[in-house]
């Protein structure tokens, strides 16, 4: 320990530097948002509540390829399909268990027809475990309710896909 280090520790220069740094940040503008009262805008890529989309003619987009079910790391998606008379497949059952879902977005990326999407909706709850088990009809209702926002988000994100 040299003389310079000894004098520096004697006058507590490091402590004074730390207090100066704390003092500068103490009077800086606060950036904390009081969430329920104040809301910040969510990104178009925000991954919230799931939705199933329809084509403009009203037909559901899901072709029952089951890629979303296969790619889901949490095994939160359950799909049962049926063959139609015209040869196409459609879902008979499409369920998402939100208690298992980790909101990774893999289902959205895997879907070849943009049928399953994650919306910006982050405020949903359930009083019982079963309330967070979304069926096909519930997911289609979410998609119908937020279709304008979903379409705008997809358009804003199109150049990155």
Swiss-Prot record:
Keywords: 4Fe-4S, Cell inner membrane, Cell membrane, Iron, Iron-sulfur, Membrane, Metal-binding, NAD, Quinone, Repeat, Translocase, Ubiquinone. [4Fe-4S] cluster 2 binds at residues 72, 101, 104, 107. It catalyses: a quinone + NADH + 5 H(+)(in) = a quinol + NAD(+) + 4 H(+)(out). Residues 52-82, 92-121 form the 4Fe-4S ferredoxin-type domain. One of its GO terms (biological process) is aerobic respiration. NDH-1 is composed of 14 different subunits. Subunits NuoA, H, J, K, L, M, N constitute the membrane sector of the complex. NDH-1 shuttles electrons from NADH, via FMN and iron-sulfur (Fe-S) centers, to quinones in the respiratory chain. The immediate electron acceptor for the enzyme in this species is believed to be ubiquinone. Couples the redox reaction to proton translocation (for every two electrons transferred, four hydrogen ions are translocated across the cytoplasmic membrane), and thus conserves the redox energy in a proton gradient. This is NADH-quinone oxidoreductase subunit I. The gene is nuoI.
